[in-house]
Amino acid sequence: MSDSTFIQRIARWAVLPAAIGLGFGLSAFSAPAAEAATHYCNGYKATIVGTNGADDIEGTSGRDVIVGLGGNDEIDGNGGDDIICAGSGHDEVDGGSGNDYIHGGSGHDSIEGGSGNDRIYGSSGNDHVEGESGKDKVYGNSGHDLVEGGTGKDKVSGGSGNDTVKQRYASDREEDRWEDRY
């Protein structure tokens, strides 16, 4: 390799980081947004996409469609009527405020709906699903789940498996409807 070839290679590698840093600004770090076009949650195109590693994903104050993919993720929907699919891994999900749709995916997940009228679905793992406040629909699905309605008039089902359904608020006892048909 001649000296001029070596210098050209260095110049090419030096220009690339500068172009990324100056020409594209922070958008150079938006790889999840580029991937969002290929991922869907409950039929909606994702606006925020995690990776196959362990991610800490924060939604916005508006409506988000979040797909966690693999890994043991921590997902916070924050505000808005969010649609969240946690994906595989042992995930922790908090829907935040708003009327959210949350699906845990495979793995042993911990899901809290937050405030609002939420629809929450565990999946094949041993999940802890909790509606919190609002008129929620909470489903453990398969696995040995802990299912809690929270405050409000809730519809709760453990699904198949050896489940525990917990009533946290005595004043709410007459409001909730338990639906296990397995």
What name fits each language-model region?
Residues A54, R63, N72, D81, ...:
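Consensus positions within tandem repeat domains that build extended binding/scaffold surfaces
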Residues S160, T164-Y182:
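Short, low-complexity, Pro/Ser/Thr/Gly-rich segments in the mature regions of secreted, periplasmic
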Residues C41, G50, G59, G68, ...:
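Glycine-centered beta-turn/loop sites at beta-strand termini
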Residues L22-A33:
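C-terminal segment of classical bacterial N-terminal signal peptides
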Residues E35-D81, R181-Y182:
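N-terminal segments that cap or nucleate solenoid repeat domains
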Residues S4-P17:
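Bacterial N-terminal signal peptides that target proteins for export
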